[in-house]
Amino acid sequence: MNLDKDLERIALQEARLQFRSFDAHSAWVLGSRLRALAEQRNLAITIEIQVNGNPLFLSAMPGTAPNNLDWARRKKNVVTLMRRSSYAVGLQLQKDGTSLIEQAGLELRDYAAHGGCFPILLRGTGCIGTVAVSGLPQRDDHELIVEALAGMLEERLEELALDNLA
């Protein structure tokens, strides 16, 4: 994994995966898309979508545990505070050789700079909410969200996906 390359690609994802509008119906469509991907691949994930602190979609697939929802909450807190994907925040901290505690005094009980939460971005407005997935390795959580967003926004996934680690 090349940190700089991944951070550059995530910045591109955040620039291109933006909505013109987003409401409760949009949250349902996005959440349903994520759930369908999880069902097709037999993934045990929790999905949470919120806008302005209001939970609009929550789903826990078979095989998940309450801990998955807590991880989603902690990743969501990072995105809400930093206005960047939780994976980008974590990779930047890794690159800088620091942590959330050292950099911002944030308690790990409430914040997790791990992949799996992406800002819901409105063009011309910025971050209005989050979409979180928990249950897979962090890179996979992040990529699943990007895949669902790219499909919904009719963006070319091959231009946005992170490089394959294999």
From Swiss-Prot:
What SUPFAM superfamilies does the entry give?
GlcG-like
Q: Which Pfam families match?
A: HbpS-like
| HAMAP family xrefs | UPF0303
What family does the database annotate?
Belongs to the UPF0303 family.
Protein name as it appears in the record? UPF0303 protein Avin_29320
Q: Where does this protein come from, organism-wise?
A: Azotobacter vinelandii (strain DJ / ATCC BAA-1303)
